[in-house]
Every structure is written in structure tokens, then in C-alpha cells.
Amino acid sequence: MGVDLGDILSKKKISLENLSGCWIAVDGFNTLYQFLSIIRQPDGTPLMDASGRVTSHLSGLLYRMTNLIEVGIRVAFVFDGTPPELKAGTLAARAQMKEAAEIQLQEAIATGVDSFRYAQATARINSEILHDSIRLLDAMGIPYVQAPSEGEAQAAFMAIRGDVDYVASQDYDSLLFGAPRVVRNLAITGRRKMPRKNIYIDVPPEVIILEEELTRLGISREQLIDIGIMCGTDYNRGLPKVGPKRALKLIREHGCLEAVLDALGESIENFREIRELFLHPAVTESYELRMRKPMVDEIVGFLCNERNFSEDRVRKAAERLNASYRSGQSTLERWL
């Protein structure tokens, strides 16, 4: 889930139209997890084809990415590569949590208890889901980048270089990796039903500007990283009873994590390695950002013939995507 710094960061609500003409590097795994968790039937079951293969992610990619591209947003998906060794403990813990959620889900179904939240917690990305996602992105003409390690680090690197305007992720790790501008809620923007409630809320995109936040908080990026490490990251457990607000207070008082640990009489294993990982992550310069002409027949053939989607809905979405590509010549500088 990454580090939670939401309580100390200011987010600016914007509209999708504010992002028109921008390139956005999308945290691929984070976005697919959102689709797999949110796009579900009332009982919590994911969308599936006639063979029982999960298709929630494909629905999200087609319809929600088409909505973004229609308003002039250009997206590039960035997928994780080999995780850092420091992440092994977190990955093992996540696997255990999903196994526990599977057991709770079966118990909830057997007893008639609302199973939706347990079903959401079982979402997994396997090789088939990843392969199908990349296949659909190719057909839609959307570029994707394979990161050598952390996808958010690669996306942040692309933003630092100026190749993209924003990084899109629900997590705050992108800021620790140095992303100048992060947009949240990109894939879930709109009117959304609250789980297990007959209540709808509007979910707007939110933008966080790193330099503005550092200035407002009176800290450096290195100090923000130290705050994240104190709270807990994908690479370490946080200090007991230390959340983002207290961590900020401690950094302001003591200046750096070393001094905080000395003052509290605490320790965090490998914290210098973790700090270095955020400051100098493994990234690649080998990528190309170019929107291509959507292959309408390929989209329809894959989703309708192989994954049992409604041909009428899919074809309409694919034609909208194609129309956006054609009309983009006069309004977007980075189209072909």
C-alpha cells in the first residue's frame, strides 16, 4: 500500500479538463488493483467471462482510459519490474493478508454475511491479468513502460526529466521518489457508489505539487523521506505510535532521522538503505512515449470474441477512442 502521508499533505481538487494536453505516467499495478477491487458485481464477485477469467481490469482499461483520452489526456502505463530485496517482507505479508481474506470471504458467503469487503481484499494480479492488460493497451494505442524495479520510481523519473507532466497513483511513494506533480483519483474520478451503502459521492482528481508541499511544511525532500520511513514504507515497519503528524513534528525538532532515533531511543533496520532507495532508485531511460492509432477490430475481437464483452458497448468505446485520435491532431502537440 505504500507510505501514508495523506494527513500532512495538501491536495488541490481539479477537473479532468484541467489535465487536457498533459502526459501522465500511470502506476500500472496500482491502477489495475483499483479496477480489480472496485469494478465488481453487487455481491463482490469480479466481472468474469464465460470461462471464469476475471475481466474487471479490462473493463476499467477500456472505458476509463477512453474517458481520459477523450478529454485530451495522454497516458503511459508504467509496470513494476523486479522488486527491491528490502520489499520481500511486505510482499510476503500481503500474500498472507490475501489468503486470510479468501478464508473470510468463504466464511461470509457460507453464513450470509455481506461479503463485498472481503471479496475486494482478495484482488490479485497474476501473469494472465498482466498479459491481457498489456495486450489491450497495445490495441488501444496506449504506450507502456517496463520499469527495472519500482514502477512509481520509474514514473517519477520520467516526470523529473519532463517527459510526462504528472504521475498518477493513489499512493504517496511517488513523492518520496521525487515526482514533481502527482495526481490521485485519476482512474476512479466521477460519481461512485459507496460500498454496501446506497450512497453516491463525487470523486474528483486531486493534485499534489511536491515543491509547494515542501515549502509549506518547511522541510526538504530528504526530510519527507525520513518522515515516510518513520511512518512505515513498503521496505520497513514504522516507529510505534508515530503517524505522519508526529513524524513531521519530530523532524522539525531534530532535523533528521538519525537524530530522531537517538532522541527516542529507537531503531529502524536498514533505514539508510531505504533512504538511498528513494533518492537513487533503479530506473531506465529506454522508453518511448507515443500514442498510436487504436486498432478497433483488434479491441473488439479480443474483448468480445475471447472475453465475452458486449460488442455494441465495446465497439462504441473503441470508435470514441479512434475519434479522439483523429481529432487530436489539431489540439495536442504530442500526437502523430
From Swiss-Prot:
PROSITE patterns: XPG_1
Positions that bind Mg(2+) 2: 171, 173, 234
UniProt binding sites for Mg(2+) 1: 27, 80, 150, 152
Family annotation (InterPro entries): 5-3_exonuclease_C_sf, Flap_endonuc, Flap_endonuc_arc, HhH2, PIN-like_dom_sf, XPG-I_dom, XPG/Rad2, XPG_CS
GO MF assignments: 5'-3' exonuclease activity; 5'-flap endonuclease activity; DNA binding; magnesium ion binding
EC number(s) from the headed UniProt entry: 3.1.-.-
Cofactor note: Binds 2 magnesium ions per subunit. They probably participate in the reaction catalyzed by the enzyme. May bind an additional third magnesium ion after substrate binding.
This protein's UniProt keywords: DNA damage, DNA repair, DNA replication, Endonuclease, Exonuclease, Hydrolase, Magnesium, Metal-binding, Nuclease
Cofactor(s) for this UniProt protein: Mg(2+)
Region ranges (I-domain): 114-255
One family name in Pfam for this protein: XPG_I
Keyword flag Nuclease: yes
Start and end residues of each stretch annotated as N-domain: 1-98
EC class (word): hydrolase
Any one biological process term the GO annotation gives: DNA repair
Assembly information from the UniProt record: Interacts with PCNA. PCNA stimulates the nuclease activity without altering cleavage specificity.
Family: Belongs to the XPG/RAD2 endonuclease family. FEN1 subfamily.
NCBIfam families: fen_arch
Function: Structure-specific nuclease with 5'-flap endonuclease and 5'-3' exonuclease activities involved in DNA replication and repair. During DNA replication, cleaves the 5'-overhanging flap structure that is generated by displacement synthesis when DNA polymerase encounters the 5'-end of a downstream Okazaki fragment. Binds the unpaired 3'-DNA end and kinks the DNA to facilitate 5' cleavage specificity. Cleaves one nucleotide into the double-stranded DNA from the junction in flap DNA, leaving a nick for ligation. Also involved in the base excision repair (BER) pathway.
Protein name: Flap endonuclease 1
Organism (species): Methanothrix thermoacetophila (strain DSM 6194 / JCM 14653 / NBRC 101360 / PT) (Methanosaeta thermophila)
